[in-house]
């Protein structure tokens, strides 16, 4: 049986996450009291109507504070039943959450006459502390639109063919912000930039003209070898420490050329020695 617990601050994308999971065969329960988590898991295990039990539950600030405090105990009880249970935590920066609430005109679950929306959003972080501390996967949705979030959720949660650590190697552009949910970040902006070659500007690091240009640059090759040597040595240590998810981010200026090229190469070589290696290009449209 597999269970995914979805949590996060209001406005971060939890409803979208549940929709994605439901579309992919998960039985979903929204706003489950944390104290009922072990009981729900037990009932799902003995339910003969579920050929392959896939369960997703949302636990967030709508819970009683006393239930959230007990979350670590409830999670431990679930895992003692030999259930593969992942905790997903979604978040976004405060300005983005404020904007989303302003656009939808929805009421924050913690807002009152004496508590502003900004205060409610900040208080929510403290309330969800017990869940944040135990999250296996954290996704920051600040720079993701609805479709990008759905793709990210499918990639991280549903494309994990085997148990163990799932490694995501992700290219990005610094001009759109650094991915705050990355575990390791490599800055490759010091490398020769194909953008300044008019004939290469409109191509990406996935296309042969850019590949041909970057593959003969000594600094690019040296950077690749250094990053690969580091990852090849240390990623197995991450896996040995029972990490469920590790995100490695490779950044250049725009996220179209250098970071894409290196991310593709690193993904190809690491897939030869590690299981569950995924590649994503955040800023390629």
Curated annotation (Swiss-Prot):
Protein name: Nucleotide-binding protein Psyr_4150
Protein role: Displays ATPase and GTPase activities.
Species the sequence originates in: Pseudomonas syringae pv. syringae (strain B728a)
Protein family: Belongs to the RapZ-like family.
Binding site for GTP: 60-63
Keywords on record: ATP-binding, GTP-binding, Nucleotide-binding
Binding site for ATP: 8-15
Pfam families: PapZ_C (PF22740), RapZ-like_N (PF03668)
């Amino acid at each position: 049986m597999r269970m995914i617990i979805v949590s996060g601050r209001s406005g971060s994308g939890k409803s979208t996450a549940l929709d994605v999971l439901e579309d992919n065969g998960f039985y979903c329960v929204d706003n489950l009291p944390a104290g009922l988590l072990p009981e729900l898991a037990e009932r799902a295990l003995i339910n003969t109507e579920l050929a392959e039990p896939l369960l997703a539950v949302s636990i967030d600030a709508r819970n009683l504070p006393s239930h959230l405090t007990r979350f670590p105990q409830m999670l431990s009880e679930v895992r003692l039943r030999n259930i593969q249970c992942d905790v997903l935590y979604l978040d976004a920066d405060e300005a983005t959450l404020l904007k989303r609430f302003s656009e939808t005109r929805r009421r924050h679950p913690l807002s009152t006459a004496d508590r502003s929306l900004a205060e409610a959003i900040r208080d929510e972080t403290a309330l969800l502390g017990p869940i944040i501390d135990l999250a296996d996967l954290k996704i920051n949705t600040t720079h993701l639109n609805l479709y990008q979030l759905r793709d990210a959720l499918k990639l991280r949660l549903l494309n994990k063919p085997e148990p163990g650590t799932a490694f995501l190697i992700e290219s990005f552009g610094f001009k759109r912000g650094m991915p705050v949910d990355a575990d390791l970040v490599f800055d490759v902006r010091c490398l020769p930039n194909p953008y300044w070659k008019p004939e290469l500007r409109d191509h990406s690091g996935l296309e042969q003209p850019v590949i041909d240009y970057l593959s003969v640059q000594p600094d690019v090759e040296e950077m690749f070898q250094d990053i690969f040597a580091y990852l090849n040595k240390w990623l197995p240590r991450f896996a040995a420490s029972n990490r469920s998810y590790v995100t490695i981010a490779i950044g250049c200026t725009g996220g179209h050329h250098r970071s894409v090229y290196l991310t593709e190469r690193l993904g190809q070589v690491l897939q030869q020695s590690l299981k569950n290696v995924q590649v994503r290009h955040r800023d390629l449209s």
